[in-house]
Amino acid sequence: MELPFAESWKIKMVEPLRKSTREDREQWIKEADYNLFQLKSDQVYIDCLTDSGTGAMSDRQWAAMMMGDESYAGSASFFQLKETITKITGFEYVIPTHQGRAAENVLFSHLVKAGAIVPGNSHFDTTKGHIESRKAFAVDCTVDEAKDTQLEVPFKGNVDPKKLEKVLAEQAELVPFIIVTITNNTAGGQPVSMQNLREVRAIADKYGKRVIFDSARFVENAYFIRTREEGYADKTIKEICKEMFSYADGMTMSSKKDGLVNMGGFIATRHEDWYEGAKKFCIPFEGFLTYGGMNGRDMAALAVGLDENTELETIETRIRQVQYLAAKLDEYGIPYQRPVGGHALFVDADRVLTNVPKEEFPAQTLAIELYIEAGVRGCEIGYILADRDPVTRENRFGGLDLLRLCIARRVYTNNHMDVIAAALKNVYDRRNEIKRGVKIVWETELMRHFTVKLERL
């Protein structure tokens, strides 16, 4: 008999969870203006809002924290981190930042000017926000297959080479760089193939452009290359990562995802001119170059986390849990972005709440219903997150409207996955009774989903 799969870790410490009543949750979400970001953590039973900074660290990471060097300049923990990053990516120049959006802010302050065009694959919210706040334009070049949530394609996060080439052929002089998000979060945590990274590199070289990877989940991307792309099944995760980054000129990183830490980020590049340009913005925005907004102990934990997560057993355990949840939804017939991604399951709200018009934000409505049902907090990745068009100020309804259920790393058991799936099934079973959604009563100009105020219709 073949032995079943089991996690690659055991539990040393636990945190109690609090259940609540349906009446409590109905009151709490109303007080939060129907914005799940405004809920207090003790009002949540299972938190699937994000996988960013919500994971559990290993005993090795905690041990490394005790050895953290808090020197303002020349911290030994920085050089330990730099050595690890260079070993995994091949990038020589490293600037730490307090998280991923800070890395974008520092690097884009150097590279993105008003009127610039930045093509890529479904820029995530902070990436798009940092581009558009500089009066520049993010152009989505994701493959069209990503728009069909029921289509089984192994690399739905890919850049469409024809779309990318068209942008460069027409407006190359306005393009400071190409950005590739690995994995493609907005499209459902979908991976980018190694072949596609080669194609992007070739197009970039043709037009003399550089390539940045938004690398928050680069280890998950490497795992999918190993399991889905021919020629990589016998490669280690570290070998695949090294090849992936060979097709890039630099990276921004939110270490709160695949770095397995609660806070941190960095910029890494092979180009001295990018490093020198970013330095000028790191010091006033983040801090000195050898800490950049991070404590020494956090840099030490990050170095260990990067090394741990680029081992097959660690990343496989993480992705197998997400696949377990997907299998439960398959059993219940609930539609989601297929195949399931690495960090989250993205429920197709347009296919679930078919009676709720897009103008009333089906994914946000589904997120509210799931919270009321069982205290499970998800996150809308759809029409609210898309913000308004910066020119017309109209809502952007052209993309997908998804409920993202992120799974924190090394935190929940499969019993929790069963609860999430059962709660979704309960909502799905009464989907035809849900005919109205929400309306916006207050919003900010950029990244409105964090603070938007809504009313239930």
Each model region followed by its residue ranges:
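Conserved PLP-enzyme active-site core in the AAT-like
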Residues: E2-Y34, Q38-G55, Q61, E70-V94, ...
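Flexible glycine/proline-rich, aromatic-decorated loop/lid segments
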Residues: F137-D140, T269, W274-G277, R297, ...
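Short glycine/threonine-rich loop-to-helix capping motif typified by GTGT followed
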Residues: V192, F346-F361, P390-R396, R448-E455
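Phosphate/diphosphate-binding loops
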Residues: K256-D258, P362-E369, E373-A374
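Short amphipathic alpha-helical segments
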Residues: M263, H343, D401-L405
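Short, conserved charged micro-motifs
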Residues: Y275-E276, T354-P362, R410-V419
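PLP-dependent enzyme catalytic core of the Aspartate aminotransferase-like
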Residues: N309, E373, L385-L457
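Conserved glycine-rich beta-strand-loop-beta hairpin in the small C-terminal domain of fold type I
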Residues: V322-Q323, Q337-A349
